[in-house]
Amino acid sequence: MQYFKTYLSTAPVIATIWFGFLAGLLIEINRFFPDALVLPYL
C-alpha cells in the first residue's frame, strides 16, 4: 500500500489528474458560456 501511495504522489499522475480536471472545467464553462473569450462578469 505504501508503494501505491508513492505512485499516486508522483508528478505524472498528479499532472494527469490536474489537467483532466482543468479540461473538464473549461469544457463546462464553454458549455454554459459559449464563445466567451473574456469573462466580463468577474
From Swiss-Prot:
One Pfam short name: PSI_PsaJ
GO cellular component: chloroplast thylakoid membrane; photosystem I
One GO BP annotation of this record: photosynthesis
Cross-referenced SUPFAM superfamilies: Subunit IX of photosystem I reaction centre, PsaJ (SSF81544)
Alphabetical keyword list: Chloroplast, Membrane, Photosynthesis, Photosystem I, Plastid, Thylakoid, Transmembrane, Transmembrane helix
Membrane topology: Single-pass membrane protein
Entries under Gene3D superfamilies matching the protein: Single helix bin (1.20.5.510)
Membrane-spanning intervals of the chain: 7-27
Signal peptide (from-to): none
Cellular location(s): Plastid, Chloroplast thylakoid membrane
Function, in words: May help in the organization of the PsaE and PsaF subunits.
UniProt record similarity statement: Belongs to the PsaJ family.
PANTHER family: PHOTOSYSTEM I REACTION CENTER SUBUNIT IX, PTHR36082
Protein name in UniProt: Photosystem I reaction center subunit IX
Native source species: Chaetosphaeridium globosum
